[in-house]
Amino acid sequence: MTNYLRLTPIFLVFILSSCSSIYIPSVPNTPMLTTQGEIAAGAHISLKGNFNFNSAYAVSNHFAVLANGAFLQNEKDKKDIKHKMIEIGGGYFKTFGPENNRILEIYAGLGSGKSDRLFRELDANKNILSIDHQKANYDKKFIQVNYSSKKVDNLKLFGVNFGLNYGTALRMSFINTNNFYINNVLQPNEDNIFLEPVFYTRMILSDEVQLQYTSGSNFGLKSRKFLNAGNSVFSVGAVVNLGRKPKK
């Protein structure tokens, strides 16, 4: 019985730590670019406090470059999580459909991230029974397809009409850990492939500024202990588009 009680905190910490993932997906960059010289920038935050920054620049009428970043620092009694990531990429965009109000974007890129997670098992008096400290770096490659429509639907809110745009993105992320430590002991690295479908809605405040709500899922194609699909995408933010040519 005594041995069982000693093992219980360790077992509970393992269960707790396996419920979340080293990898926290960022908000996909969905700039909805239309013309050369256009700049898009967005800032988003999730309920867990994951802050994301996305930017894009249309180098030509069909080619764009991207830069993204994410940062999270969440501290609680039983769990502290620190996570940061940067990405760069580029790709193709094209407008089509009635009045060219539909946009297809195909991007690819690479990035890197750092994860620092501390799990604590506490007793009824909040005394620490055990600690599990996990640190890892990881490399990321991704390919992403965005489809969006600039056809405007209307939402009446507080007596004011706001236009709405909709879009979806499907991202495939290839993640590999390196320098993965648990309690200062080097661990075998893990890899996984994540499918990340995302849907977003934009509320138009002006020609340049929109509010964006994003929701999506995260599916891991491989079974892994620590690099799993333990996090989804749910955020609100704002997007700015500058340099867009006016409609003729």
Report the location of each language-model feature:
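Transmembrane beta-strand segments that form the barrel wall of outer-membrane beta-barrel proteins
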Residues: 31-48, 53, 60-77, 102-108, ...
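Short boundary motifs at domain starts and secondary-structure transition points
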Residues: 29-34, 156-158
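C-terminal motif of bacterial Sec signal peptides marking the signal peptidase cleavage site
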Residues: 15-18
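Bacterial N-terminal signal peptides that target proteins for export
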Residues: 1-8
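Bacterial signal peptide processing site
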Residues: 20-23
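Feature captures outer-membrane beta-barrel proteins of Gram-negative bacteria and organelles
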Residues: 30-32, 51-69, 83-97, 141-151, ...
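Outer-membrane beta-barrel transmembrane domain signature
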Residues: 115-248
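Ligand-binding grooves and catalytic loops that recognize ribose/phosphate and carbohydrate rings
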Residues: 72-115
